[in-house]
């Protein structure tokens, strides 16, 4: 049976709609009373695992799920050994550098050498500032990253932005974009090749919905 890792959170609703459009119903995950983390489609064709977004590529990489849906941001941050099969074109957001609106720094290259940047996307932030040849200290924060500059812990943050409302409410402005992110369909590379007859028809159906 096909096993699919589906992320909790912002991508869940659109992921459920996508699978419904190809004949797989995992809508029970949307029921507020649901406590199950694994459900089987009523047609008994596939089962879905409801996991944290950061864990989706882990379940796929280790072969516990043949397919998964994950944000492009996590693929760049975690660099898992998975096959990236399709851009699903939902869940749009962007990875941005932001500073307080009152900051004298209007561009990342204006940040002071060895300045501090708070982020939960440590690898993405390191790579970005490395390309700028700007030595900064990346402070890993996994809660409200916006508090970094507010409390004076950091001069800037690197974080995902969708509407920009949270930044605005906390007095922050974007000064650069690292990359844009949407949901992607991923697969376990070996499982995909060995079970092509089972998996590929579903992948084709998903791709057809995107065209």
UniProtKB/Swiss-Prot annotation:
Q: What class of enzyme is it?
A: transferase
Subcellular location, record wording: Cytoplasm
Query: Example GO biological process term?
Result: L-histidine biosynthetic process
EC nos: 2.4.2.17
CC terms in the record's Gene Ontology section: cytoplasm
Which InterPro entries does the entry link to?
ATP_PRibTrfase_cat, ATP_PRibTrfase_CS, ATP_PRibTrfase_HisG, ATP_PRibTrfase_HisG_short
Q: Which UniProt keywords apply?
A: Amino-acid biosynthesis, ATP-binding, Cytoplasm, Glycosyltransferase, Histidine biosynthesis, Nucleotide-binding, Transferase
Q: Which domain of life is it from?
A: Bacteria
| Catalysis performed (reactions) | 1-(5-phospho-beta-D-ribosyl)-ATP + diphosphate = 5-phospho-alpha-D-ribose 1-diphosphate + ATP
Function of the protein: Catalyzes the condensation of ATP and 5-phosphoribose 1-diphosphate to form N'-(5'-phosphoribosyl)-ATP (PR-ATP). Has a crucial role in the pathway because the rate of histidine biosynthesis seems to be controlled primarily by regulation of HisG enzymatic activity.
Domain remark in the UniProt entry: Lacks the C-terminal regulatory region which is replaced by HisZ.
Q: What is this protein called?
A: ATP phosphoribosyltransferase
* Species per Swiss-Prot/TrEMBL record: Rippkaea orientalis (strain PCC 8801 / RF-1) (Cyanothece sp. (strain PCC 8801))
């Amino acid at each position: 049976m096909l096993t699919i890792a589906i992320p909790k959170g912002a991508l869940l609703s659109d992921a459920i709609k996508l699978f419904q459009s190809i004949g797989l119903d995992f809508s029970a995950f949307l029921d507020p009373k649901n406590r199950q983390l694994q459900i089987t489609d009523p047609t008994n064709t596939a089962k879905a695992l409801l996991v944290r977004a950061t864990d989706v590529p882990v379940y796929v990489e280790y072969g516990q799920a043949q397919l998964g849906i994950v944000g492009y941001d996590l693929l760049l941050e975690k660099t898992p050994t998975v096959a990236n099969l399709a851009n699903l074109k939902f869940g749009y957001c962007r990875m941005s550098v932001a500073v307080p609106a009152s900051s004298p720094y209007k561009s990342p290259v204006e940040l002071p050498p060895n300045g501090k940047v708070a982020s939960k996307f440590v690898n993405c932030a390191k790579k970005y500032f490395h390309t700028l040849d700007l030595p900064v200290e990346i402070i890993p924060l996994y809660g409200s990253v916006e508090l970094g500059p507010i409390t004076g812990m950091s001069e800037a943050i690197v974080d995902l932005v969708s509407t920009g409302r949270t930044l605005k409410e906390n007095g922050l402005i974007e000064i650069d974009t690292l990359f844009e992110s949407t949901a992607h369909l991923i697969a376990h590379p070996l499982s995909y090749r060995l079970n092509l007859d089972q998996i590929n028809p579903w992948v084709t159906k998903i791709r057809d919905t995107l065209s």
